[in-house]
Curated annotation (Swiss-Prot):
The UniProt record lists the keyword 4Fe-4S: no
UniProt cross-references to Gene3D superfamilies, sorted A to Z: 2.70.40.10
UniProt-recorded name of the protein: dCTP deaminase, dUMP-forming
Gene Ontology BP terms: dUMP biosynthetic process; dUTP biosynthetic process; nucleobase-containing small molecule interconversion
Reactions accelerated catalytically: dCTP + 2 H2O = dUMP + NH4(+) + diphosphate
Keyword Transport recorded: no
Keywords: Hydrolase, Nucleotide metabolism, Nucleotide-binding
InterPro entries (alphabetical): dCTP_deaminase, dUTPase-like_sf, dUTPase_trimeric
A GO MF label: dCTP deaminase (dUMP-forming) activity
EC number(s) on file: 3.5.4.30
Family statement: Belongs to the dCTP deaminase family.
Amino acid sequence: MLLSDRDILVEIDAGRVALEPYDPGMLQPSSIDVRLDRFFRVFENHKYPHIDPAADQSDLTRMVEPEGDEPFILHPGEFVLGSTYEVVTLPDDIAARVEGKSSLGRLGLLTHATAGFVDPGFSGHVTLELANVATLPIKLYPGMKIGQFCFFRLSSPSEHPYGSAKYGSRYQGQRGPTPSRSYQNFHRTPI
């Protein structure tokens, strides 16, 4: 079940769902807006001839931070990693989805490529996969509204929430935009 603004407030007030820093003005009818942090990971396209999800390519991206109040410029066709300013923490019976803001989508900004799901039990900054599909550069200001979290109550608490030993939870506690760690549990079925 998708949580309403009332339900979201109840969960925040009870300390079960946490967003730090929390701003009550970000609450929407069935979501809560989140803001863009000031750190970005840009791809070093000259490091490898291709991206290999089975290999450790930790140096595929480098961290960039705009100076002062300057925006980060996302060029047409460019893809970078960003993250939410807020740290989100979920209990074992609530999951979340990261969605973009309609106003930004109308400018050609995509907030996530495929990783819009946040598992119950997760705690950390949420990494955003930012892409510019417009024909002009887009200015991304640290602290601007960048997306929204929608929360869903599970039919029962997760037996093994994110962060438990069973799944490895490679991104638990992540700070800032975190590069892919797909190689740590790469699986390929012989076909």
